[in-house]
């Protein structure tokens, strides 16, 4: 699907904000399974994944990462830290909006990518669990009842209806 672009100009700040979304193709699996990995398993302090998951700096951006007390998922602002298959992108820090068939949405920030050897031919989902989204969590804060699948929690319950890649930046006018 083509990009949708919104431009706004503030007469006070002389800044143009550009927001672009691109809806990406979905695999044939439902994406209902939403697995997780422990964020502290990423130990290479020089890696982009480590920077995003641990309040580091990558490509000139410093991330302020926290753990959501309700879900145990690592977060950067309003974005849940997650891995996707390389079909959806490989640049750490890329942001996405996921819409479920229940109408609920949640936002994720790419902190890691699934290994191509563990994904389908198009690299959209993990072959073993058929998961599209894999959250990064604090192992000590996973809620009871998750049992390996965040689809069991209300905010994430449902099949994936769409994934949109988000781009947002501010540019000062000259």
What are these regions (language model features)?
Residues 21-174:
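Solvent-exposed, well-ordered loop and adjacent helix/strand elements within mature globular domains
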Residues 1-32:
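Intrinsically disordered, low-complexity repeat and linker tracts
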